[in-house]
A protein has these predicted regions:
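Extracellular/periplasmic helix-loop-helix junction of adjacent transmembrane segments
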Residues: 27-54
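Transmembrane alpha-helix termini and helix-breaking/packing motifs in multi-pass membrane transporters
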Residues: 32-38, 91-97, 154-173
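Helix-to-coil boundary motifs at intracellular loop junctions of multi-pass secondary transporters
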Residues: 34-38, 68-69, 127-132
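A helix-boundary/kink motif common to multi-pass secondary transporters
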Residues: 40-41, 70-74, 102, 133, ...
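C-terminal ends and interior cores of transmembrane alpha-helices
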Residues: 81-99
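Substrate-agnostic recognition of the 12-TM MFS/MFS-like secondary transporter fold
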Residues: 12-28, 51-64, 73-85, 105-164
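Alpha-helical transmembrane segments of multi-pass secondary-active solute transporters
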Residues: 45-48, 75, 140, 170-172
Length: 173
């Protein structure tokens, strides 16, 4: 925790990943709920639930690409901006009339965004290692992992609550 308070590079990287985790957690739970409202909902919910598997299966390849990237900071910024643009497109598209075809487009956007997120996370790990002294690295990584896990759990619950509170108004997300 001390590293978070005194090291601006570490704090920036952690905050960036936490914001990414918040967005992903909110979106993932809302997307499964959205899938349950389209035609052929059993298949849609199954596909939405399984969509997280594709980026996980590709994570080794994505990690290698991230390791080989020469301008990690530039790629990380580009990755996060690309994710933001994808989510803006998604916010527009999700407001259109529901159909299974539209759901598949949204699913593809979700998978691409998750792959980009994995790439961005892979880029940030070496930056994290360079921004924290070796003696503080274990505690910094512990806080990093614990924070991300906690944020994901909390915001999945918040996402489910908010979507009900917003009367299933998906474009608000």
């Amino acid at each position: 925790m001390n590293e978070y308070l005194k090291n601006i590079k570490y704090r920036t990287l952690l905050n960036s990943d936490l914001i990414d985790s918040i967005g992903n957690s909110l979106y993932d739970i809302v997307f499964v709920i959205y899938a349950s409202t389209v035609s052929n909902k059993s298949l849609a919910v199954s596909l939405a639930s399984m969509a997280t598997i594709v980026p996980a299966l590709l994570s080794v390849i994505i990690g290698v690409w991230a390791d080989r990237a020469s301008k990690k900071v530039n790629y990380m910024i580009l990755t996060r901006l690309s994710q933001a643009l994808l989510f803006m497109a998604l916010a527009f598209l999700i407001g259109l009339n529901k159909s299974f075809g539209l759901f598949l487009v949204l699913l593809l956007i979700n998978i691409i965004s998750d792959i980009l997120g994995n790439f961005g996370n892979g880029l940030s790990l070496p930056l994290l290692q360079h921004s924290v002294a070796e003696k503080d690295l274990n505690s910094a990584m512990g806080l990093y992992t614990a924070s991300n896990t906690t944020i994901q759990l909390i915001f999945q619950a918040i996402g489910a609550t908010l979507i009900v509170g917003f009367n299933y108004n998906y474009p608000l997300f």
